Amino acid sequence: MGVERIKAAFENGKKAFIPYVMGGDGGLEILKERIRFLDEAGASIVEIGIPFSDPVADGPTIQRAGKRALDSGVTVKGIFQALIEVRKEVQIPFVLMTYLNPVLAFGKERFIENCMEAGVDGIIVPDLPYEEQDIIAPLLREANIALIPLVTVTSPIERIKKITSESEGFVYAVTVAGVTGVRQNFKDEIHSYLEKVKSHTHLPVVAGFGISTKEHVEEMVTICDGVVVGSKVIELLENEKREEICEFIQATKQKEEA
């Protein structure tokens, strides 16, 4: 399915709620169970983190989750195996969030073959500059897997146009300067930034980094096409507050009807 499965998540004005889970945090059975839960709860896409020892874009919550996964001996191969197994049960799109190093260490051809086998639909590589994306972009295109671009508040318009013109899936618009994590509120210029990104791409635009309340979700999906919630979802899963994740999903869906 690949790119088409991601496109379907945004069809007919749908707003996407994209939770992030760290692959292997709590073990691989827990990963499969969490994906099943998020699928049943109505999440649009699930973003699965590949743990890495030097996660430069991650805030403390995601760093701790990655460290727990690595300390427990979880491997990239193990995560792929878990995804292969759970893919038989769910149709929710899978997007991997991985730094470049694990891809190259695993072998990029082998990594992408495993993505295909596991039914991965897209990949986000936060430390892969646009200028160097040919390291993996041609292989991903061949495999019908979206290489999802990140744009930031400081990205000039021309760069946003260039980055998004050749991309597939959706555009990940980073809503804060700095790392991931929970924020209290967003500055007014974030609204104009998101509108600017939307006006310069044909792809759906999803806001991420720092989104941690229902009010944040409602605010963001009035402007763009969806949200990624990472640190807060990890906290809620850890503390068994799953009903709050369902409330986030409900807040997203309500904006479809508004």
UniProtKB/Swiss-Prot annotation:
InterPro entries: Aldolase_TIM, RibuloseP-bd_barrel, Trp_synthase_alpha_AS, Trp_synthase_suA. GO terms for cellular component: cytosol. The keyword ATP-binding does not apply. It is an enzyme of class 4 (lyase). Pfam families: Trp_syntA (PF00290). Pathway: Amino-acid biosynthesis; L-tryptophan biosynthesis; L-tryptophan from chorismate: step 5/5. The keyword Lyase applies. Keywords: Amino-acid biosynthesis, Aromatic amino acid biosynthesis, Lyase, Tryptophan biosynthesis. One of its GO terms (molecular function) is tryptophan synthase activity. Its EC number is 4.2.1.20. It catalyses: (1S,2R)-1-C-(indol-3-yl)glycerol 3-phosphate + L-serine = D-glyceraldehyde 3-phosphate + L-tryptophan + H2O. The active site is at E47, D58. Tetramer of two alpha and two beta chains. HAMAP family: Trp_synth_alpha. Belongs to the TrpA family. The alpha subunit is responsible for the aldol cleavage of indoleglycerol phosphate to indole and glyceraldehyde 3-phosphate. This is Tryptophan synthase alpha chain. It comes from Bacillus anthracis.
